[in-house]
C-alpha cells in the first residue's frame, strides 16, 4: 500500500446557500481530513487505506460505501454498536463565510484505539495523520501516536498535517499534541495561522521561525490560495499563490496534502510537490464539497506546467 491514513470520517449536512434555520433542503456527503486525502490519492492512481471507526448506522454505511467506491481500502474501517457516526453541520452565512458545527462528542470515531492498527507497517510506503485525531479522545490520540511509531520502525514515511480545530480543544492542547506528534513525523504541513498559534505571536516572521525550528525533514508552511514555503536542510523553497475564485474554503488544506503527497509518492521533486499541492487546493476550493473537486489522474496538471519554485 502506498498511503495509509488514520482518522475519523463524518457525514456532512450542508445548507449550501443559506443558514441552517432557513434551509428547506440540505446536501449530504462524506467529509473528514484523512478520508479526503485517502480519496484524493486513490483518484490519482495510488493505493490508499483508512483506519478508523464508524457507527453501525446508516451514516456509517454510507461512509464505508463511499470510500470503497472511491477505491480506498476500508479493511480497517470498522463499524461499532457502541457509538454513532459523527455528523458535521456546514452553514453558508453569506460573503463567503462558512460556519461548521460538530456533533462528534462520544462518536464512533473517538473510540478508535491501538487495536485498530496494523501490527506491522512493512509494505506501507507512507502514513498520513492529522492533528484532529490527536484531540478526539485519549484512545484516538494513543492510536495515532502508536501508528506513527510503528510506521517509523518499519521505515514508512510519516506526514503530519496540523489541521487545528479550535472547536475540539483549547489552543494550548492543540499546540502541545501537535508538537508531540511532530517529533515522530518526517514531513509536517501547517497553515500560517496555526504556525502563529504555535509561536505564540502574530508578529511577522514568528510563525515562519517556528516552522523552521521543527526537527523534520520537510516543514511546509501553507498560505492562502495554494501558496506555500518549504524548509529543508537544503534551504527554503517558495511557490506563489494561485488566483482562484473561492466557492468553498473547507478542504483546501487536505487538497494541498493530496497534491503534495501525490508528487512525492511518484518520486517527484519538492518544488513540484509544492506546486502540485497548490494546484489541487485551487481546484478544490473553486467547488462545493470537501472531496468532490479532487482531480483524477487525467485531470492532474503535468509537472511541465508548473512554475519554477524559488529556492533561497
Residue ranges of model-derived segments:
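Conserved phosphate-binding/catalytic region of the ribokinase-like
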Residues: 1, 153, 203-312
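Glycine-rich phosphate/adenosyl-contacting loop at the front of the ribokinase-like
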Residues: 1-72, 312
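Structural motif
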Residues: 2-4, 125-126, 187, 218
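Glycine/charged-rich beta-loop-alpha catalytic/anionic-binding loops adjacent to active sites
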Residues: 16-25, 129, 235-244
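Short beta-strand scaffold segments in enzyme catalytic cores
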Residues: 39, 87-91, 227-230
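Short, conserved phosphate/pyrophosphate- and ester-handling motifs at nucleotide-, phospho-/glycolipid
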Residues: 41, 191, 253
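Conserved N-terminal subdomain of the carbohydrate kinase-like
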Residues: 47-131, 302-303, 307-312
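Conserved beta-alpha-beta core of the PfkB/ribokinase-like small-molecule kinase fold
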Residues: 126, 132-209, 226-227
Amino acid at each position: 500500500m502506498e498511503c495509509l491514513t488514520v482518522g475519523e470520517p463524518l457525514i456532512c449536512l450542508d445548507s449550501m446557500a443559506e443558514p441552517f434555520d432557513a434551509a428547506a433542503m440540505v446536501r449530504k456527503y462524506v467529509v473528514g481530513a484523512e478520508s479526503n486525502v485517502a480519496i484524493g490519492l486513490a483518484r490519482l492512481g495510488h493505493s490508499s487505506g483508512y483506519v478508523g471507526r464508524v457507527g453501525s448506522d446508516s451514516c456509517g454505511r454510507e461512509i464505508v460505501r463511499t470510500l470503497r467506491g472511491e477505491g480506498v481500502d476500508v479493511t480497517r474501517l470498522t463499524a461499532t454498536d457502541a457509538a454513532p457516526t459523527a455528523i458535521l453541520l456546514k452553514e453558508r452565512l453569506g460573503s463567503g463565510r462558512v460556519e461548521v458545527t460538530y456533533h462528534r462528542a462520544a462518536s464512533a470515531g473517538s473510540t478508535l484505539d491501538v487495536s485498530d492498527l496494523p501490527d506491522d507497517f512493512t509494505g506501507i510506503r507512507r502514513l498520513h495523520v492529522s492533528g484532529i485525531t490527536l484531540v478526539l479522545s485519549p484512545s484516538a490520540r494513543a492510536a495515532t501516536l502508536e501508528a506513527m511509531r510503528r510506521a517509523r520502525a518499519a521505515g514508512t514515511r510519516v506526514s503530519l498535517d496540523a489541521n487545528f480545530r479550535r472547536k475540539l480543544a483549547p489552543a494550548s492542547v492543540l499546540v502541545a499534541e501537535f508538537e508531540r506528534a511532530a517529533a515522530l513525523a518526517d514531513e509536517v504541513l501547517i497553515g500560517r495561522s496555526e504556525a502563529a498559534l504555535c509561536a505564540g505571536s502574530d508578529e511577522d516572521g514568528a510563525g515562519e521561525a517556528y516552522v523552521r525550528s521543527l526537527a523534520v525533514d520537510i516543514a511546509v508552511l501553507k498560505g492562502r490560495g495554494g501558496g506555500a514555503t518549504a524548509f529543508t536542510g537544503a534551504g527554503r523553497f517558495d511557490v506563489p499563490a494561485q488566483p482562484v475564485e473561492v466557492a468553498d474554503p473547507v478542504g483546501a488544506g487536505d487538497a494541498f496534502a493530496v497534491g503534495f503527497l501525490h508528487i512525492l509518492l511518484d518520486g517527484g521533486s519538492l518544488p513540484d510537490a509544492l506546486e502540485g499541492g497548490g494546484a489541487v487546493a485551487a481546484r478544490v476550493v473553486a467547488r462545493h464539497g470537501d472531496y468532490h473537486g479532487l482531480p483524477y489522474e487525467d485531470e492532474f496538471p503535468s509537472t511541465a506546467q508548473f512554475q519554477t519554485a524559488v529556492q533561497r
